[in-house]
Amino acid sequence: MQAVEQQKKSKLWALLSGILGIVWGGLIFVAPSYILPNIFSIVIFSIVFPFTAPSEETLQILHQTQTMFIYLVAFIWVMFIVARISHRYYKKTGEVPYWVTKIFLLAASLGVIATLPVLLSYIPGLTGINDVTLQIGGMGSILIITGGVSGLLGLISGAGYIISLNRFDR
């Protein structure tokens, strides 16, 4: 009997997945401390002075924060689509270890789960869902932790994809 030889897979999806995973992990760990430094002052301001009129600067910071969040949500959904495609593309091949594709898919899925309550609040009629979600005992912190775990797993799997690129030359 002749052995059926599997055709070589392209390393484009591995490169794209690696870059997306590393960038996502970097964004998750850098964003709270560098990109959104004023978010904590806004939260404290809104807790301490709930009945004062917000200043123009505060409104601008809120707008920038919301814009940054929309970019992060778009990034995580693109990463989720790429993770699904690359998981299916490299299934049962030797180029990319199976655990790398699984962890990348898990990282993207956790990121999508963390963004769902806020995304649903943009739908007319469901605008109060974010308030309800954040009022459930510690749900806001659970979503933040889920995003952080997603970033860590994205960083690990992105590095796994980049390391596995040298397997394609064999």
Q: Across the structure, where does each feature detected by a protein language model lie?
A:
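Cytosolic juxtamembrane helix and N-cap/initiation of the first transmembrane helix
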Residues: M1-P37, I163-R170
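Juxtamembrane transmembrane-helix termini
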Residues: A31-Y34, N38-I44, S86-K92, S121-D131, ...
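Residues within membrane-spanning alpha-helices of integral membrane proteins
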Residues: K11-G18, G25, L105-A108, I144, ...
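Cytosolic juxtamembrane helix at the C-terminal end of the final transmembrane segment
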Residues: A3-S10, V82-V100, L153-R170
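Generic alpha-helical transmembrane segments
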Residues: Q66-R84
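Interfacial non-cytosolic loop connecting adjacent transmembrane helices
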Residues: N38-Q66, L116-T146
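Membrane-interfacial loop-to-transmembrane-helix junctions in polytopic alpha-helical membrane proteins
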Residues: Q6-K9, W13, T58-L62, Y89-I103, ...
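Transmembrane alpha-helical segments of multi-pass membrane proteins
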Residues: S17-G21, E95-L116
